[in-house]
Amino acid sequence: NFEFRPTPTLAFALAPRAQYAPHALPSYEQFAAGNFTVGRGYDPSVLSGDIAVALASEVRLGSLIPASRNDSAVQGYVFVDSAWLWNNNGGSTGSAQHLTSTGGGVRAAIGDRFKLETSLAVPVSKLAALGGRGNVRILVNLTMNLLPWKRR
């Protein structure tokens, strides 16, 4: 992952992903696009392939580093995700499957224990598997840091 932060409260982030296989792979080894990694506007694993190139890009405002362990910090962001996937079918890769999604959201660090992320994701590409673009979705992720557990 790459992040360029020209000021303490502005960041540009890129998260490239890639996979190459010279032969067909079982489904559990294929690159999957959709949901929280790349393709946030789509269902998990809506597209999968043996060969893939993907990029998740974000512009972030704010910082997720609280002033103290009891404070909170908020970061807003907008994103564009894209992925291109190919399947090896008898030695021929054929044409690429492609998806793009865009959106924005808010991340919050709550003390030194919790992180909350909420985003609105919009599918841009029409996928044959969905019969179109699909629906706009709201994604919510809550993470709790269990260790180290400190007494206050």
Enumerate the predicted regions with their spans.
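C-terminal outer-membrane beta-barrel translocator/porin domains of Gram-negative envelope proteins
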Residues: 1-88, 128-131, 140-145, 151-152
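Transmembrane beta-barrel architecture of outer-membrane proteins
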Residues: 52-56, 99-103, 137
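Small/polar glycine-rich anion-binding or flexible loop at a beta-alpha turn
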Residues: 76-81, 97-101, 122
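A short, conserved beta-to-alpha structural element at the edge of catalytic cores
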Residues: 100-123
